[in-house]
Every structure is written in C-alpha cells, then in structure tokens.
C-alpha cells in the first residue's frame, strides 16, 4: 500500500516523464497577488501565465501545491472535524499546460496515471466522469478513445442559476479566461450511501471527486460573449489526501497514514484514549495549516492573515482543552508533522525552532483567558431559551477573552445553539466607529482624491525641479486655483518630492514662484500621481502654472540615513537572531527609525548589544549603497529580500550594501553606509505576540541622544554626591537601605495593627449571636490588613471581619471568616460583593479573601452592603 509521501512523489514523477517541469510549491502567502488571502489552488502561482502577463521557460508544469482554505471566500474552518474531507490545509496535485497540449492529452494523462499498474492501478470500473453538457469533444475522448462506458459519463449543465454557471464550467472571474471542465469520481461501493454526480443522492460519500481537469478555451468579455482563446490551456487539481484515502482503502481522509500518525501523537500528548474523537481530527488538521503558515512568514495577530492563523491556533487549543490537556501541547506536534510530511516537510523543518516557539507562546497567551471565557460562555448558554446566543455575549468573548467568533460558534454547535451574528456584527461595527472617531484628524485626502495620470519622480537624483501644476484639490474637491491661507493638495507633472511608501515618510519643503509660496508639509501617493499636501502662505496658484519644487534637503538627508540604517538593522537581526526574522512593519523619518519584525521571544541585552555593534561595524566599513533595476526573478536569484504580500512590477529596484544587505526598495538612501555615522538603539519591546519593535536614531540625532544620556547621568551622580563611574554602586546602596527601612516600617505597622485589635474586638456587633467587625481603615496596605484580620480571628474565636482601606486613591478590601462559619459565609463571596461597589474584583479562600477597587468615594457604601448582606445571611 502506497504511503501519502509515495503518492505525492509518483504524481510528480509521472508528469515529469511526460515532459512537465516539476515546480516547487509556492508559499501559502501569495506573491504578487495581494487580493488573495492564502494560496488555495495549484494554479495560483501560474495565474499571470494563464493571463498572458508572464512567460515561463516551460510550457508544461506539475506541482504538489500546499493550500489553505480558512478565512475569506474559501473557508472550510467551521467544517473541519465534523466531516470526512474538510481541511484547513491540504495538498493539491496538479499538471498544467500553457498553450501546449489540450483535452486529448490531458484526459489520457489522467487516465493513464490513475489506472496503469505502473502508477496507481485503480480499477477502471470504479471510475466515473462528468463533462460539461455541451462539451462533446471531452465526452467523445472519454467514451471513444479512453473507453469509459456511456453509463459512467455524466453530462452536467448550468446548475447554478445562470448561463455557464455550472459545477463543470470554471471561470477565473466575471471576465477573462474560462472553460468547461471534466471531473473524475471514485466509486467506494454500494456499502456506502450516496448516488453518482447529478443525482439526488450526490452529497453522499459513495462517489468522491478525486480529480478536476479544467480546459481554459474561452475569454469571457464584459457583455458575456465567449471568444475562443488562441492558445487554450489546461489546469488540473487532485487532492492528495483524497486520492490517498482511495489507495489506502479508507473512506475518510482522517484515516490515511499522515493523519493516523498525527492523531495518535496528539492522543499520547494529551492523554486521550478514544482515537475517533473529533477534537483529535481538528488538532491533527490544524497543526498542518498553522505550522506551514508560520514557516511561510505569517505571525499570529489581530488582523488579516495573522488573525486567521490566530483563529486556527485558538480553535486547536480549545479542542485540546476538551480532551483534557493541562499544559501547552500544540507545539509538541511539530516534530511528528515534519516526519510524516517527508520531503514536503522541509520548509517547516528549516524553521522548526521558530514555528514551535510561536505556537507555544500563542497557546500560553490564550490559556490565560480560555478558562474564564469558557465559564462565561457556559453560563450564557445555560440561560439560552430560544436556541440563539446573544451577539453581545459573543462579542464580549471576542473583545475581552480573545474568542474568535468561529470558536464560540464551535462550542454553540455542540449544543445545537446558533449565534445572533447580526448583533455581533453591530457590536463590531460600533467598535470600529469608536476607533475611527478616536484616530481621525485633519482631512483624509486618500478617501476623496482621484487623479488619472502619472507623476514623473526625479527625487533619486534631484532635490529641486521646475514643474507644472496639473491639478489642485481644496477641501477634497478639484479646483482651478487656490488663494493664500488655504490648505490644499497640489499635483505636479514631475517632482523631486518623495511620496510616503515603504515605511519612509513623505518629503516636505515648498513650492514657489514669483510672489508665491506653498509650504509642503507632506507628500502622498494617489494612484500613480504624487500629492503635495500643505498650505499656501502667500500669493495664488492655478492649474497650468509652473513652480520651483524644492525639497527640505536636510530633512531628506536625515531620513535617507535612517532608511539605509533600517536595511543594515534588518540584515543584522537575521544574522544574530536567525533567518526567521522578517520585516512586519517600519517607519522611517528624519528623526528616528522604527522597525517591527517577527521574533517569538524577548531579545537579551547581550543580543541587543551584538546587533547594535554589528550595524556600526557595517557603517564603519563604508560600503557603497548600490541600486540596480532588474526583473523580479533576477532580483530573487541574487538573494534580494521581498516583503510577503507586496505587489511588485516587472522591474524592481534592488538596493545592495556590500555583501551584507540586499533588498527590494524604492526609497531614498545614503550614498555610502559611512554617511550614517552612528547607529544607536533607544528602545526594544514587544508589540504583539511574536512581533518585536526596535526604535533607533542615527547620525547627529544619535550623538544628541548620547549627549542627553550623559547629561542625565551627570545630574544623577551630582544629586547622589557620586561620580558617573560609581553611580550604579551608589544606587544599589540606596536600594538596600530603602528595603531595610521599608521592612522596619512594615513591622511597625503590623505591630500597631495588632495592638489596635483589642479596640475592634470591643466594638464588634452581634448578628444572630455572631461577632461582626465591618470598618473603614484609611492609609493601611493590604498586607497589614491581612495581619490584622488574622489576629482578630484568633481573638474573636468565632466571627466575620470586613475591612476597607483607602491608600493612594485606591481601595483595598480584606474579609476574614473563622473556620466554624465558612459553611454558610464565604469570604470570597462577601469580598466580591464589596468590590462591586468600588469598581473592582477579587477572591481567595473561604476563610480569607482580598480585593481591590478604583472608586474610593464608594467605600462607605461597600461597608454598608457588607453589613446588610451579613444581617441577611447570618
């Protein structure tokens, strides 16, 4: 019996023998296609080839493409674990013809691979095929050449409500390449329910589609007209997991060798015994998508691809919790995954350390809120009477406890409860509105300015140009002229001003002509034109007028130093921390640089020092900063780094600094690394799970920062009557002395508290024979209150003590209950009741509990509530 790895390799070997180029699986993050969330089909990496926008040195290709369908239009997440064949991650085996062979060869290749004893050797009588209703050519090839009986060939027409909307007609979009397809089905036998495709029972599991062969032979125009393509092509896809299930004689994808091994390992780690539990299937599926997404550069976050990854991880963690996992388990599956994926696991293996760290950190982070969130959800579900969970509750779980909506839906599904998603969406929209209102300032020109044409950029070599005004915008509207005092956007035919992009801020400066000055505060791109945003301080400007465009050269120079330093920093991070480091965001201004990057754990002081030292070494090396224009494939062949998800043109600008750094970049840079002068890191911290941020300064700004630090050190040394060299020792002495005094003071407070205890015993009131002390004591910290409560419990023998203290505008609450009363009076219950009055929360043991609060004005009310509650319950 063939393993899944052997089937994958045999497919590639077969098509290689038929003259196909074996092409590596592309990344799960689509390159040059920001419209696509994840790679979800084998043809994604060849999309531009099919559209005629890209040429390859081969006309036949074959791949084993990794795919993810979670989030976006293609989303299988909610079905994973509940069906035999849904996955977030799967491999698509495919063969492609770019104007080479067509229907006859495509069909014969598929049949030979499936049925030949040399390859898969499937019984011919087990295979059924479908064709598009009017595709007589494909029908005849199947029937007359291949020999499939007419009763096992099914014509499928337009079954989706409009012309050419059919299971057997494929289209790339509303317009563009399209064509009929033929699908091959495997019959598992009459012991399994289901009917052939096109029948009322087609949704059963007896007849399973294993291969789809698409014939791209038309170009659909906007009016619906179908034109024949001059060079028709072929795009095919066969799910590796499905064909493995057929060849391994199982009816569920989760019973093939890869999943059996992952399920067994998961059960071993979490201590599960029922290997058919759906939670094991969920986890086995999710480790594949999560590991490969991280290996391809996706980091868990709260937006975009990162949020889909976070949703999948959290769903897996929740199912581990259902199985009884008591500690982090998910990351422990990575070594087994690498093993079962064989050759296809090499990309995860190359980044194994980073994959495991990120999975562990994300799981640990979610574990902190999982229990509390599930408790809230359980309570809410117990009160559901109409089978619908409130959207407000679902949003609170999302907003406060980090529960993605599909995770909450997963829990609800197990209890046959649905979610009011409209209410959830309203809450989400309200939050977005609040966030937008909080962040809005000035005019959002991007939302109102639409300009055709293209601005010629001259800023790589010039800081001053003569230019003609092609458009003016005032208050977001196109105008013919502007007057002094008006803020506006000026569009020029050509410009030396750099428009904000790639993290680099837009240039500032001014536009001038005789008697006219327009102060440019920022430069932004609107499509292909550059907008100069600012204020006309004197004179008037009109469309068609010529002006001198003059960039603030000093600001531009400082910005260029920071941009070049950012490239050196990126290279240094990868050299010292590892190749898992990739850019996740940047801001390059004239004053400083900020760089966000993938890094699963904190950076040590020693590593930070190494990074800074390495960057400064490369600055002193005084490398020339070289720029070259080349096609993107040549750039990547040279090792140039490109950002995931960025769309690049046919030609790209490659920036090289010696043998240390090579990146794609369109920004402004220093001429030599030595121009940077000095690089100094000023902060380093985490900004999200798995993402760190470094802020740094360069050149004169770095020198100024160091001078300021020296000034602070000198002033501090003077205050402590020390010198800079012995300052740390002097501070340590002061800290030791302070700790000693604080300890002595605490002892005095505790002694005073115990001495005051006898006075409280005398003032205790009796409620149904039980001694109760409920008092406000200001200026006493929690630790002293606890000592006092313990002492009073001993003195009373039997009783309840509730103290509230205001210290530094915060409320401290402590409740003590003697052991003989804890059966009916719980300290935690009482302290929480008091905490609600002062805007806080707390907890503890039945005999001792503490809480804090932020509303000292309500302390008297908290004491009264405690007294009333005790009157009622004692």
Curated annotation (Swiss-Prot):
Domain characteristics, as noted in the entry: Consists of three domains; the N-terminal catalytic domain, the editing domain and the C-terminal C-Ala domain. The editing domain removes incorrectly charged amino acids, while the C-Ala domain, along with tRNA(Ala), serves as a bridge to cooperatively bring together the editing and aminoacylation centers thus stimulating deacylation of misacylated tRNAs.
Protein biosynthesis recorded as keyword: yes
Catalytic activity from the UniProt record: tRNA(Ala) + L-alanine + ATP = L-alanyl-tRNA(Ala) + AMP + diphosphate
Gene name of this polypeptide: alaS
Single biological process term from Gene Ontology: negative regulation of DNA-templated transcription
Function: Catalyzes the attachment of alanine to tRNA(Ala) in a two-step reaction: alanine is first activated by ATP to form Ala-AMP and then transferred to the acceptor end of tRNA(Ala). Also edits incorrectly charged Ser-tRNA(Ala) and Gly-tRNA(Ala) via its editing domain.
Family, per entry: Belongs to the class-II aminoacyl-tRNA synthetase family.
InterPro entries per UniProt: aa-tRNA-synth_II/BPL/LPL (IPR045864), Ala-tRNA-lgiase_IIc (IPR002318), Ala-tRNA-ligase_IIc_anticod-bd (IPR018162), Ala-tRNA-synth_IIc_core (IPR018165), Ala-tRNA-synth_IIc_N (IPR018164), Ala-tRNA_ligase (IPR050058), Ala_tRNA_ligase_euk/bac (IPR023033), DHHA1_dom (IPR003156)
Protein name in the entry: Alanine--tRNA ligase
Protein location: Cytoplasm
Enzyme Commission number(s) from the entry: 6.1.1.7
An example molecular function term from Gene Ontology annotations: zinc ion binding
Keyword Zinc: yes
GO cellular component: cytosol
Keywords attached to this entry: Aminoacyl-tRNA synthetase, ATP-binding, Cytoplasm, Ligase, Metal-binding, Nucleotide-binding, Protein biosynthesis, RNA-binding, tRNA-binding, Zinc
Binding locations of Zn(2+): 563, 567, 665, 669
Cofactor note: Binds 1 zinc ion per subunit.
């Amino acid at each position: 019996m063939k393993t899944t790895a052997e089937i994958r390799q045999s497919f590639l070997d077969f098509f290689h023998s038929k003259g196909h180029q074996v092409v590596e699986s592309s990344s799960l993050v689509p390159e040059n296609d920001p419209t696509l969330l994840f790679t979800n089909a084998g043809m994604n990496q060849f999309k531009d080839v099919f559209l005629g926008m890209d040429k390859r040195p081969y006309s036949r290709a074959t791949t084993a493409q990794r795919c993810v369908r979670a989030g976006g239009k293609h989303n299988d997440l909610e079905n994973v674990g509940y069906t035999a064949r849904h996955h977030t991650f799967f491999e698509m085996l495919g063969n492609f013809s770019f104007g080479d062979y067509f229907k006859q060869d495509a069909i014969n290749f598929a049949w030979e691979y499936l049925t030949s004893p040399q390859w898969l050797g499937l019984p011919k009588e087990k295979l059924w095929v479908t064709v598009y209703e009017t595709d007589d050519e494909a029908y005849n090839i199947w029937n007359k050449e291949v020999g499939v009986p007419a009763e096992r060939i099914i014509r499928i027409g337009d079954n989706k409500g409009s012309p050419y909307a059919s299971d057997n007609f494929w289209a790339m979009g509303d317009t563009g390449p399209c064509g009929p397809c033929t699908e091959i089905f495997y019959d598992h036998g009459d012991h399994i329910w289901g009917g052939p495709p096109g029948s009322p029972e087609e949704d059963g599991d007896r007849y399973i589609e294993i291969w789809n062969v698409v014939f791209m032979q038309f170009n659909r125009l906007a009016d619906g007209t179908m034109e024949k393509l001059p060079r028709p092509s072929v795009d095919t896809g066969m799910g590796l997991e499905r064909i493995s299930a057929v060849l391994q004689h199982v009816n569920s994808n989760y019973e093939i060798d890869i999943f059996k091994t992952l399920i067994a390992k998961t059960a071993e780690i979490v201590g599960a015994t029922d290997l058919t539990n759906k939670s094991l299937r969920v986890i086995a599926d999710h480790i594949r998508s999560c590991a490969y997404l991280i290996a391809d550069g996706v980091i868990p976050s709260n937006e975009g691809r990162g949020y889909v990854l976070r949703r999948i991880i959290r769903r897996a963690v929740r199912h581990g919790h259902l199985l009884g996992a008591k500690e982090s388990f998910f990351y422990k599956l990575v070594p087994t995954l690498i093993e079962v994926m064989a050759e296809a696991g090499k990309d995860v293996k190359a980044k194994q350390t980073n994959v495991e760290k990120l999975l562990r950190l994300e799981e640990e982070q979610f574990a902190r809120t999982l229990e509390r969130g599930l408790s809230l959800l359980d309570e809410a579900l117990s009160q559901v009477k109409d089978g619908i969970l409130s959207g407000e509750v679902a949003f609170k779980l999302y907003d406060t406890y980090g529960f993605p909506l599909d995770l909450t839906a997963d829990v609800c599904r197990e209890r046959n409860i649905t979610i009011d998603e409209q209410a959830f969406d309203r809450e989400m929209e309200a939050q977005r509105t609040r966030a937008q209102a909080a962040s809005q300032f000035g005019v959002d020109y991007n939302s109102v300015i639409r300009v055709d044409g293209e601005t010629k950029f001259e800023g790589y070599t010039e800081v001053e140009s003569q230019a003609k005004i092609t458009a003016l915008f005032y208050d977001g509207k196109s105008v013919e002229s502007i007057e002094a005092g008006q803020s506006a956007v000026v569009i020029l035919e050509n410009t030396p001003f750099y428009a904000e992009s790639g993290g680099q801020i837009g240039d500032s400066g001014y536009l001038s002509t005789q008697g006219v000055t327009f102060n440019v505060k920022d430069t932004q791109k609107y499509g292909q034109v550059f907008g100069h945003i600012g204020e006309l301080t004197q004179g008037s400007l009109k469309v068609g007028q010529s002006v001198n465009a003059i960039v603030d050269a000093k600001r531009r120079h400082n910005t260029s130093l920071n941009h070049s330093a950012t490239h050196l920093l990126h290279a240094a991070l990868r050299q010292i921390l590892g190749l898992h480091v990739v850019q996740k965001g940047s801001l390059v201004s004239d004053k400083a640089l900020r760089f966000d990057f993938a890094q699963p754990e904190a950076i040590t002081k020693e590593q930070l020092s190494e990074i800074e030292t390495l960057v400064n070494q490369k600055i002193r090396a005084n490398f020339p900063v070289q720029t070259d224009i080349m096609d993107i494939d040549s750039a990547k062949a040279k090792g140039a780094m490109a950002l995931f998800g960025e769309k690049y043109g046919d030609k790209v600008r490659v920036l090289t600094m010696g043998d240390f750094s090579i990146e794609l970049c369109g920004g402004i840079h220093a001429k030599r690394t030595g121009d940077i002068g000095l690089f100094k890191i000023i902060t380093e911290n985490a900004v999200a799970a798995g993402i760190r941020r470094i802020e740094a300064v360069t050149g004169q700004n770095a020198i100024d920062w160091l001078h300021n630090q020296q000034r602070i050190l000198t002033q501090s040394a003077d205050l402590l009557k020390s010198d800079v060299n012995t300052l740390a020792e002097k501070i340590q002495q002061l800290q030791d002395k302070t700790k000693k005094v604080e300890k002595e003071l605490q002892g005095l407070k505790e002694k005073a508290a115990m001495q005051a205890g006898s006075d409280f015993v005398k003032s205790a009131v009796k409620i149904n024979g039980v001694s109760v002390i409920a008092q406000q004591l200001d200026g006493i910290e929690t630790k002293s209150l606890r000592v006092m409560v313990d002492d009073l419990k001993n003195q009373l023998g039997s009783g309840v003590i509730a103290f509230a203290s205001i210290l530094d505008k915060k409320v401290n609450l402590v409740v003590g209950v003697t052991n003989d009363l804890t059966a009916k009076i719980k300290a935690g219950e009482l302290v929480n009741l008091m905490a609600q009055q002062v805007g806080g929360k707390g907890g503890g043991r039945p005999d001792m509990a503490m809480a804090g609060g932020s509303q000292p004005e309500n302390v008297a009310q908290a004491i009264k509530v405690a007294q009333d509650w005790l009157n009622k319950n004692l």
